[in-house]
Amino acid sequence: MMARFVSVSSCQFHFGFREVSPPSVTSYPRRFEVSDRRFPAIPIKCSSSEPENGEDSAPSLSSSSSSSTSEVSTSNSSTYNWYTGIGGIGMLDTAYLTYLKVTGSDAFCPIGGGTCGDVLNSDYAVVFGVPLPVIGFVMYGVVTALSAELGEGNLPFGISKSNGRFALFGITTAMASASAYFLYILSTKLSGSSCLYCLVSAFLSFSLFFLSVKDVKLQEIQQVVGLQICLAIIVVASLTASYSTAQPIPSRSGDIELPYFRTEISSSSSPYAIALAKHLNSIGAKMYGAFWCSHCLEQKEMFGREAAKELNYVECFPDGYKKGTKILKACADAAIEGFPTWIINDKVLSGEIELAELAEMTGFSLDQANETNQLQ
């Protein structure tokens, strides 16, 4: 009977004693007699208010949930910052490759014969008539823009964040699949040719893919793994169809023999260039190059015929180049990695350098040029 009067809410108990009169005796089949005793009466005061510790626990749970949400948000923001940074680097890399492709120039002459120019000028650098670096630039641009929008949580066209993440996952999957295929082409069809910038682009694509795998939960990946496989197959099939008529280029390092030839300099030298060349020679500056290197010839053209003769130029392959040919010992001792390379005051400088820059870094002035001309 007591259970009917006890509320489940928190109760305050006040103990007291109340005198209870003895009940009347009634005859029953079995008679019980109750003696005159004092029974403790327990008045129960019930309150509908929540206990104080309950009030304290609610804010603590809310605070814990808020802290957890904040940590997840910070982690996602950091991930999208990585996306944006890597995508930006990829845009710079492919923009430079696009410039090389459009102008037909080469980035830097390596010690071996194969260069980025060989790769970019091959049939494999074009996909359905579009230069491959241009496609790469667009893809990196999309990744950079999409990741930046995801980081801010402000996607266009009403796209949800979940759909944005899956779109990013799909794009990076396509990029990684294409990069894997290009590495296969580079190692088989373009064997012997090297392109550092192409390898950097492939590395960046794989990095973006692994980031997206980490960003998308395993359960979500299992839901779309079939779609991702189909996407990779479509990318590879499309590239194969585009390259069906492409012809592999011979390996410079193994299939071609380059006999040594003397390069002809067509430009004439100015008095300033002649004086600068003599100054560089006097301070021990050396230019290391190879006869096949177009950049080496362009550097000499800056000086002109007469001034180039005054330079301390070191030809690293004076006997020509073929498979097994070793670089000149002087070049090997100087640890030359590409052409042209300048060593000025023990400082290694790679690539072509403008005359004004050479003059500035060696302390050559116009007055010295005038003095040299007067002596002549």
Curated annotation (Swiss-Prot):
Under the GO molecular function aspect, what terms does this record hold? NAD(P)H dehydrogenase (quinone) activity; quinone binding
How changing C293A affects the protein? Loss of function in catalyzing disulfide bond
What is the recorded membrane topology of this protein?
Multi-pass membrane protein
Q: Where is the transit peptide?
A: 1-45
Q: Where in the cell is it found?
A: Plastid, Chloroplast thylakoid membrane
Quaternary structure note: Interacts with the PSII subunits PSBO1 and PSBO2. Interacts with TL17, TL20.3, HCF164, PETJ, VDE1, EDA3, FKBP13 and FKBP20-2.
User: According to its UniProt record, which protein family does this protein belong to?
Assistant: Belongs to the VKOR family.
Q: What is this protein called?
A: Thiol-disulfide oxidoreductase LTO1
Which source organism? Arabidopsis thaliana
Which gene codes for it? LTO1
